[in-house]
């Protein structure tokens, strides 16, 4: 079952639902197989794509025999070249196995050809009874000379982690948008499916997309999405598929306008139609149509005026509290108000509430 990504994904989702802590892949904490210890589940490194059960078992046997790997350089010095080819090392890095040494995963990934060659050189030296670069030294603080690189942004890190595991484990791409999603009434698929609304906005990150054709040759798509609550699958009719084909890629996140279509007399059975697709970035960065800002008694009107001084597309309404009374004002001209303004204003102590 270690190589069955679908089963593993379901297994991990069930553990999350049961609030069982999952110890993420670690070169010094994990085992080749999944193992439960003290109510926690340690992720099995043999389940990482391209790594191979035998290879990771050999690497972990070395750890058990001679102690934990102290640094990444220590790992390089001790590992056998036959257990770490390019694909195997890529899988380990992308899954976060070496995060305890350095959370900058792309630093290691970008230097893999150099690392592989270094491991081979060390192995050859050992076979020839020559002292290796680090042999006989304390490697605790030794560093490998990595090549120049650009650190991954969180979105890139999670996309690469997804490739190595088949699902998101350390975090989810949608988590960073939680607050703005709440403000915009963007919900999880499960929330939308269970509520009574006929239409709603749902956010999802693409896990896979399959394009097919009907008997009449009309294209359609079947897309599997992931959100922070789980996974869901949607059917894309030809018009939606064709107009969005170029941007529908794995690991990209979207806000979907969904509509329930009850096709049977059984009200519990609902077909969900996709009416519109927008990238998350487009949604959160575009100006809001209308915003109401409720202010406490200690509001700073001059500061608010400065923050809302730029003309734009958003209708701004202010609700001012004074002596337990509320006064409503609408700014004469529309102003610029997007995610940037929201982030600044929501943290002001005199702002009671911002609604859209």
Placement of each model-derived feature along the sequence:
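Noncatalytic, beta-rich nucleic-acid-contacting surfaces in large DNA/RNA-processing enzymes
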Residues: 1-356
């Amino acid at each position: 079952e270690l190589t069955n990504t679908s089963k593993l994904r379901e297994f991990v989702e069930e553990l999350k639902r049961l609030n069982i802590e999952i110890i993420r892949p670690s070169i010094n904490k994990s085992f080749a197989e999944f193992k439960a210890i003290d109510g926690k589940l340690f992720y099995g490194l043999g389940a990482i794509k391209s790594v191979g059960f035998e290879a990771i078992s050999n690497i972990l046997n070395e750890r058990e025999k001679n102690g934990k790997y102290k640094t990444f350089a220590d790992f390089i010095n001790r590992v056998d070249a036959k257990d770490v080819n390019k694909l195997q090392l890529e899988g380990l890095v992308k899954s976060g196995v070496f995060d305890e040494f350095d959370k900058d995963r792309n630093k290691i990934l970008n230097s893999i050809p150099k690392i592989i060659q270094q491991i081979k050189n060390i192995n050859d030296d050992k076979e020839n009874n020559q002292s290796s670069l680090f042999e006989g030294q304390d490697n605790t603080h030794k560093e490998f000379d990595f090549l120049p690189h650009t650190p991954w942004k969180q979105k890139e890190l999670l996309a690469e982690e997804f490739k190595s595991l088949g699902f998101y484990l350390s975090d989810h791409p949608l988590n960073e948008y939680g607050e703005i999603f709440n403000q915009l009434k963007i919900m999880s698929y499960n929330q939308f499916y269970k509520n009574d609304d006929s239409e709603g906005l749902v956010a999802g990150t693409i896990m896979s997309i399959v394009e097919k054709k009907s008997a009449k040759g009309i294209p359609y798509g079947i897309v599997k999405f992931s959100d922070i609550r789980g996974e869901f699958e949607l059917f894309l009719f030809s018009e939606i598929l064709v107009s969005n084909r170029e941007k529908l890629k794995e690991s990209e996140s979207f806000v979907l306008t969904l509509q329930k279509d009850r096709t049977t007399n059984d009200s519990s059975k609902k077909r969900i139609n996709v009416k519109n697709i927008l990238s998350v970035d487009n949604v959160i960065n575009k100006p809001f149509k209308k915003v109401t800002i409720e202010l406490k008694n200690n509001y700073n009107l001059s500061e608010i005026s400065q923050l809302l001084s730029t003309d734009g597309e958003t209708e701004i309404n202010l609700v001012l509290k004074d002596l337990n009374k509320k006064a409503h004002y609408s700014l004469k001209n529309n102003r610029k108000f997007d995610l940037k303004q929201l982030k600044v204003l929501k943290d002001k102590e005199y702002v009671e509430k911002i609604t859209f």
